[in-house]
Amino acid sequence: SPSRGLGDVYKRQAIDVVSGEFKWVFAISQITYGGGALVAPDGTIYQCVRNATINNVYAINPNGTQKWAVKLDAAIGAFPALSADGVLYCLTNKSTLYALDASSGAIKWQQSLDGATGSAVAIDKAGNVYAGTSAAIYSFKSNKEQNWKLEEVNVTEQATFALKDQVLYATLKNGGLVAVDMTNGTKKWTYPTTKGDAYFPIADKNGNVYFTEKGSQTVHAVNASGSKIWEKNVGNNLNYSGGALSTDGILYIGTQSNNKVLGLDITNGNIVFEETVGQQVMAAVSIGPDRRLYCGTIGSNNIGSIKAFAVNKTLATDSWSCLLYTF
């Protein structure tokens, strides 16, 4: 979480999910924002940060100590991606795609892409890498060989892709969703919207895709053919809002205005869950294996908190809130 104090300090915290108590804090100076943390199977945390003058990719051990850090060619707003064979892919704001050795941070290869901004990166089960910028979407093999390139696509910054049944779904700057054939890079369809940047697509087991739209306070549901299932105006700003999909068919999202986390029935978009969290939510929410929702919030002076609360209010373990102070 970014905070203001003696200079700008970004603190990656580890918090006990049962009690809400801090386990450790890892501070990174002089940065503001960056894509969310990626946690590897061995517990290593990888964090990219949006600053070009300091180390901007960090690997943090499970105990909160630094494993390695490296400086790439520009600030990084995009979320990183980790392959099964231990390669960390990072896409900088200069639209340079890097493949790093996840164990050491050594650069294996790098590739300059078209576009003023690097937006999103993902990996499929075969190890192919997908990168989206403000100008195009690319697919590469793990050895840097390019599979294909789809031009004239402006992917929303600080974004993610959804991959489902050999189709890549990307949300677009200035609104909309595009579906791309992952085998050859052809555009299958575009679902246009008109009210501002679209964020964080998420696909369910049936291939339906859900995404949020900044300007219209709307959550969209689209089927695998690109046809509308429903759209829901939730009456709250959705700035950098991403959803979490539960196994029982509820899409949870956080809102910037009205300081709420909402749950929408994915069959019809009806709001079936609502929790006031007291501060703005400007990021994706998460569902833990304990059936609790976790969200980060931000308030005045960029002082935020991590909140956890049970979806099922009959659970004995209900909720906690952990304040992230400036220091």
Language model segments and positions:
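A short beta-strand motif characteristic of beta-propeller blades
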Residues: 21-26, 66-71, 106-111, 146-151, ...
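Short loop/turn segments immediately following the C-termini of beta-strands
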Residues: 8, 50-52, 93, 134, ...
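Blade-level signature of beta-propeller repeat domains, shared across WD40, Kelch, NHL, RCC1
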Residues: 282-324
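Short loop/turn segments that connect beta-strands within beta-propeller blades
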Residues: 16-19, 61-64, 101-104, 141-144, ...
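Repeated scaffold domains used in trafficking and secretory/extracellular systems
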Residues: 31-37, 75-81, 116-122, 155-162, ...
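Conserved beta-propeller blade signature
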Residues: 4, 45-46, 88-90, 98, ...
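Residue-level detector of Asp-centered blade-edge/turn motifs that repeat once per structural unit
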Residues: 39-42, 82-85, 123-126, 163-165, ...
